[in-house]
C-alpha cells in the first residue's frame, strides 16, 4: 500500500520501551519527517511504558505515541523472558487493533519484536526492520541461524570463527544472545528474528556504508542491509538545530548538564570519559581498578554511574572526586560530552548507540565489552575501524588489573599508536558526516526507502 504525491502516508514504528531501542527509532522518524512532509509517524510500544514515557523530558519529535497491552498485570516486573513470552502470545492481536485504526503504508519494527513482520504481512502492509546493532552483528546472526556458514562448538570460547568480511573471531567475540551461556530465551529470540526476515522487505541499519562497506557487500546476495545512519543528534553531525526538531535524546534518567561547565575548564584532550551504558550495573571491583589507574596517572575524568549503584561508594573514587580530579554523574548528555574538545578518550561497553556516537564525534575508545553485541562491536572498533584498543580481564583470575587500564588509556592518548588512532577517528568523523549530508550514501538510501513506501 502507498500514497500518491500530496497525500499523507502513515508509518507505524514498533519497539520495546528501552532507551537504546526507542532513540534510534526517534532519530529515524526525524530523518523521514525532514525528507518528506507527507509522512505521519506513530510509535507503538507496550502500555506499561505509558507512565514512564509521560514523565521523561520529551524532545520535539515528529511522532505520536500509541500503546498496546503486553498481556501482563500492571504490577508485573516485566522480566525479559516473561515479557517476550507474553508478547509472542498476545502482541499480534493487540497490535492489530492499532493497525486497523489507520491505513498504514509501512510498519518499521525493532528486531526484538520479531512477531511484528508477520502481523504486517497479515494486514498486507510492507514491513521494514530497523537493525540497531552493527552490520557485522547482523551478518553473524544471519549466517548462524540461517546456516549459510559453518560455526564451531559454541561451548568452547577459544574456538575460532571465520566469516566473510570480518576479522578472525573467537567464539567469545560472538554476540552473547547466540551462546549457550546467554540463556535459551535470548537464543530463541534471535532465532525468531532470523525467521521473521521472510516477511521483511527492507533491513534498515543504523550504520553507514563507508564504515562497514565490506560487511554490507558480503550480505548483498543473502538478505541485504540498507545503511541509513548514523542515527545521532543533528549537532553531532555538524548541523544547526532545527527549530521544530531539536536534537536531544529521549532520556529515562535525567542527565546532568552541569558537567559541561566543568569540562569547559579542562585542558583540550585531557579528560577520560567513562560510561558502561544503561542496562548493566557497574561492578565495585571494576570501578576501584579503573579509579586507581586514573589516580596513578593523575588523569581528569567524567564517569557515569547510575543512581543507587554501590559502585558510587568506592572509597578511592569518592576521594578523587573530593579532591577535584573528576566528576561522577548519575546520567550524562553523552553526545554533548563526546563532542567536547576536552575529551581525550571514551572507556566504553561498546553498545552500538554509543559506538555510533563516538565514531561521529571522532573520539578514540578503550573497549571493555560485556554482553549482547558488545564483544563483536569491540572487535570492529579495534580491528576494523581502527579507533581504539581492547581492555581485557586477566587470563588467570578473570579480574581487571590496574596495569591493564593504564596500558589501554596510554595507548589511545600518548602511546606510539595514538597518532594513528586519532587520525583514523578524525577521518571516520568526516566520512560519517558526509553519509547523511545531501547526496551522501545514507541520504540516498533514505530517499529510496521513502520513495518505495509512498509510491501508490
Swiss-Prot record:
Its EC number is 2.4.1.-. GO terms for biological process: regulation of auxin metabolic process. It is an enzyme of class 2 (transferase). The keyword Transmembrane does not apply. One of its GO terms (molecular function) is indole-3-acetate beta-glucosyltransferase activity. Keywords: Glycosyltransferase, Transferase. UDP-alpha-D-glucose binds at residues 278, 332-334, 349-357, 371-374. InterPro entries: UDP_glucos_trans, UDP_glycos_trans_CS. It holds the Pfam family UDPGT. Possesses low quercetin 7-O-glucosyltransferase activity in vitro. Belongs to the UDP-glycosyltransferase family. This is UDP-glycosyltransferase 84B1. It comes from Arabidopsis thaliana. The lineage of its organism: Eukaryota, Viridiplantae, Streptophyta, Embryophyta, Tracheophyta. The gene is UGT84B1.
Amino acid at each position: 500500500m502507498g500514497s500518491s504525491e500530496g497525500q499523507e502516508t502513515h508509518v507505524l514504528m514498533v519497539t520495546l520501551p528501552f532507551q537504546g531501542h526507542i532513540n534510534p527509532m526517534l532519530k529515524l522518524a526525524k530523518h523521514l519527517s525532514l525528507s518528506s512532509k507527507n509522512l505521519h509517524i506513530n510509535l507503538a510500544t507496550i502500555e506499561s511504558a505509558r507512565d514512564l514515557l509521560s514523565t521523561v523530558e520529551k524532545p520535539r519529535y515528529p511522532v505520536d505515541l500509541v500503546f498496546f497491552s503486553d498481556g501482563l498485570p500492571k504490577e508485573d516486573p516485566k522480566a525479559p523472558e516473561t515479557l517476550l513470552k507474553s508478547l509472542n502470545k498476545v502482541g499480534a492481536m493487540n497490535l492489530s487493533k492499532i493497525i486497523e485504526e489507520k491505513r498504514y503504508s509501512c510498519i518499521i519494527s525493532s528486531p526484538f519484536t520479531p512477531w511484528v513482520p508477520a502481523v504486517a504481512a497479515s494486514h498486507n502492509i510492507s514491513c521494514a526492520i530497523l537493525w540497531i546493532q552493527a552490520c557485522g552483528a547482523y551478518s553473524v546472526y544471519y549466517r548462524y541461524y540461517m546456516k549459510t556458514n559453518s560455526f564451531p562448538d559454541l561451548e568452547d570460547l577459544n574456538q575460532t570463527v571465520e566469516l566473510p568480511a570480518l576479522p578472525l573471531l573467537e567464539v567469545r567475540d560472538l554476540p552473547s544472545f547466540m551462546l549457550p551461556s546467554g540463556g535459551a530465551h535470548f537464543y530463541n529470540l534471535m532465532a525468531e528474528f532470523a525467521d521473521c526476515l521472510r516477511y521483511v522487505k527492507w533491513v534498515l541499519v543504523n550504520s553507514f556504508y563507508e564504515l562497514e562497506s565490506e560487511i554490507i557487500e558480503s550480505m548483498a546476495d543473502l538478505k541485504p542491509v540498507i545503511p541509513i545512519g548514523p542515527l545521532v543528534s543533528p549537532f553531532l553531525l555538524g548541523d544547526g538545530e532545527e527549530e521544530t526538531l531539536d536534537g536531544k535524546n529521549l532520556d529515562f534518567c535525567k542527565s546532568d548538564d552541569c558537567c559541561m561547565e566543568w569540562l569547559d575548564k579542562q585542558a583540550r584532550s585531557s579528560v577520560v570519559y567513562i560510561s558502561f551504558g544503561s542496562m548493566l550495573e557497574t561492578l565495585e571491583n571494576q570501578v576501584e581498578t579503573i579509579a586507581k589507574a586514573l589516580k596513578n596517572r593523575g588523569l581528569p575524568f567524567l564517569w557515569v554511574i547510575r543512581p543507587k549503584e554501590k559502585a558510587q561508594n568506592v572509597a578511592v573514587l569518592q576521594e578523587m572526586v573530593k579532591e577535584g580530579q573528576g566528576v561522577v554523574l548519575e546520567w550524562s548528555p553523552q553526545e554533548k560530552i563526546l563532542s567536547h574538545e576536552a575529551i581525550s578518550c571514551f572507556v566504553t561497553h561498546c553498545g552500538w548507540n554509543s559506538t555510533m556516537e563516538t565514531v561521529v564525534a571522532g573520539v578514540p575508545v578503550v573497549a571493555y565489552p560485556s554482553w549482547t553485541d558488545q564483544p563483536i562491536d569491540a572487535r570492529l572498533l579495534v580491528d576494523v575501524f581502527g579507533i581504539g584498543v581492547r581492555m581485557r580481564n586477566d587470563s588467570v583470575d578473570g579480574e581487571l588489573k590496574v596495569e591493564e587500564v593504564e596500558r589501554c588509556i596510554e595507548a589511545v592518548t600518548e602511546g606510539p599508536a595514538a597518532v594513528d588512532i586519532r587520525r583514523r577517528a578524525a577521518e571516520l568523523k568526516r566520512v560519517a558526516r558526509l553519509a547523511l549530508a545531501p547526496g551522501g550514501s545514507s541520504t540516498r538510501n533514505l530517499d529510496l526507502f521513502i520513495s518505495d513506501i509512498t509510491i501508490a
